[in-house]
Structure formats: structure tokens, C-alpha cells
Amino acid sequence: MNREFIQSIKYLFFRFLLRRQFLLGKENRFGLKFKFKIEDVVGRRIFKLGKYERDISDFVANNIEFKDGDIALDIGANIGWYSILLNTLMPESGQIYAFEPDPLNFSLLSENILLNKAGNIHAVNKAISDKKESKKLYLYSNRNLGRHSLLESEQGDGVDVEAVQLDQYLLESHVDLSRVKFAKVDIEGYEFYALSGATKVLDYIECLVCEFVPDRMRQGGVDPQDLINLLENKGFYPSIHKAGQLCSVTSAELLNGPACDIVWLKR
């Protein structure tokens, strides 16, 4: 029997017989551990498969190299999958800033940082926007706690969160923008607003992994082309994974295609 089958049986046992509220999933490459709300899809995949978002995670683990003093950003950190993965790649003198506005996700992120002794990570309980303001975070169901969004939604409850402009926050935190080399952004269609307030640090970022959900953006009143234009004007070009390989992609393909994770690299 393979791992997924065995872990799936265990998951059903813990969820429906023991009625556990939280579980611990173990990542199978670096031995990382993640506490998660038992219904949540991110944690379920880690628990059953020992991995999450395989293509992007493997790309990061195999291709991103940090030097002493480098900095990475995780915007929409959720329970910490990418932040803690980045921590394994980062020299002792490096830093990761992990932004997560949702109270439950932030609590789990903080626990997982301690669980993995990931001392390079600074967990920040704030959202990222184009200006400093109070925003409503629209909550998705417990089945996918990573689907919360700052884009207006008619479904689900909301919680008020503090949003900051990324450039301003980093400068006020005395972060050397020139040392920021990598960023991951996954905030359910709000990426354009977040990166509109990051034009200074984008000059230094060499690789940006960014979720792209054109239909959700349009529903929330955002033109997906604006995000593409913003990043291309900063010297980035987009690629996506196809059959395990990183392939270049056109704007038209992105605009007319499904949701995907884009790897933006500098020309």
C-alpha cells in the first residue's frame, strides 16, 4: 500500500472517529512539520502526500539560492508551507518576512515556525495592500483556509484586518530592500493591489512566484492585464510549469487560461 492510501485512512480515522480539530502533517523531503485545521485542504495534502503544490515547491527548493544576508517575502503565508521551506534554504544570516492577516492561519503559522525551529522567519499579522488601511478579509469555508480574500465577496463572513503598504512597511522596519531577492504572493486575486504598493522592492526581487486567478480578479473588479503590465514594466517575464518543466507563456495565454502559479523572472 502506498503512502497516500495509508495516510488517507489515518486522516478519516482522526477526523470522523476521534473528531480531532487539528492534525500534524509531515513533509517528506526536509522532514518539516505542519499543524493544520483538520478540514483544511493545504494541511490535508501535506498529511496525505508529504508535499504541497509539488511543481512550485520543487522549483523553489531546487532553483532558489540565497546568499548571506538575503531576504525573502511570503505574502499570504497561510500556515507557513513556503516560509518554512524557504527557511531550510536560507543561510543563518538571512531572513523571511511572512505576512498572514487571518487570525487562525496566523496562529498556526506562528506555531509551525516554533515547531520547525525556523528562527529566520518574522511572522507579521497584517495584509498587504496598496496603502495602509483597515480592510475586510472575506473568509472562505474551513475546507480551504487559503481562499480568504480582500476582494469583495457575497459569500462567507468577514473579519477586519490591518493592511500595510509593502514598501513602507519594509522601510519602516529598516529592511535593506536591495537584499530582498525572492517573493511568493498568493492572496486570492488581490495581487495587483499588493504589488502596486511594492514598486520599490520589485526593483530588487529576482524571482517572484505569484498566483494568477483572472476570473476571480475580474469578479472583484480587477483587470488581470494590469498585474501583467505592472510586472512586465519592472522587467519580469512570466513562465508556468507544463509537464514538470518551466515554459514561457504569453499574456494572452494567461488572460484566457485557468488559474495558475506564475514564476516571474527578470530578463
Sequence positions of predicted segments:
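Phosphate/nucleotide-binding beta-alpha loop and adjacent structural elements of enzyme active sites
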Residues: 1-267
